[in-house]
């Protein structure tokens, strides 16, 4: 039988939560607002499927370019070029630098 290559394939450990982190994230994370030029880390939250960018961007750092409804357009460097990804605030963390 042919192996499926879905959106979440090969993410057995990448989209796994530690026991103390299980369940829904706090509401303040979903209501977080970022402004243009903010540096953010893409950290996927497996308990929220909506607005999740592709798992290959997990751990990348980018710059917020614009807001699209509830989501944000983030420019991330992938290899030698920049890519724009759309992600909800649950999957973004503010960079401390």
Swiss-Prot record:
NCBIfam families given in the database record: PRK04306.1 (NF003303)
Compositional bias segments (type: Basic residues): 9-21
Disulfide bonds: none
HAMAP family on file: Ribosomal_eL21
Matching SUPFAM superfamilies: Translation proteins SH3-like domain
Stretch list, region Disordered: 1-26
Gene Ontology molecular function, alphabetical: structural constituent of ribosome
One cellular-component annotation, GO: ribosome
Keywords, in A-Z order: Ribonucleoprotein, Ribosomal protein
PROSITE patterns: RIBOSOMAL_L21E (PS01171)
GO BP terms in the entry: translation
InterPro entries in the cross-refs: Ribosomal_eL21, Ribosomal_eL21_arc, Ribosomal_eL21_CS, Ribosomal_eL21_sf, Translation_prot_SH3-like_sf
Protein name: Large ribosomal subunit protein eL21
UniProt keyword Acyltransferase present: no
UniProt family annotation: Belongs to the eukaryotic ribosomal protein eL21 family.
PANTHER family reported for this sequence: 60S RIBOSOMAL PROTEIN L21
């Amino acid at each position: 039988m042919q192996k499926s290559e879905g959106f979440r394939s090969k993410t057995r450990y990448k989209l796994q939560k530690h026991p103390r982190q299980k369940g829904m994230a706090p509401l303040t994370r979903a209501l977080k607002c970022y402004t243009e030029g903010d540096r953010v880390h893409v950290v996927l939250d497996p308990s929220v499927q909506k607005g999740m960018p592709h798992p290959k961007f997990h751990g990348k750092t980018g710059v917020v370019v614009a807001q699209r409804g509830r989501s944000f357009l983030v420019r991330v460097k992938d290899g030698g070029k920049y890519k724009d990804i759309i992600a909800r605030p649950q999957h973004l963390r503010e960079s401390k630098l």
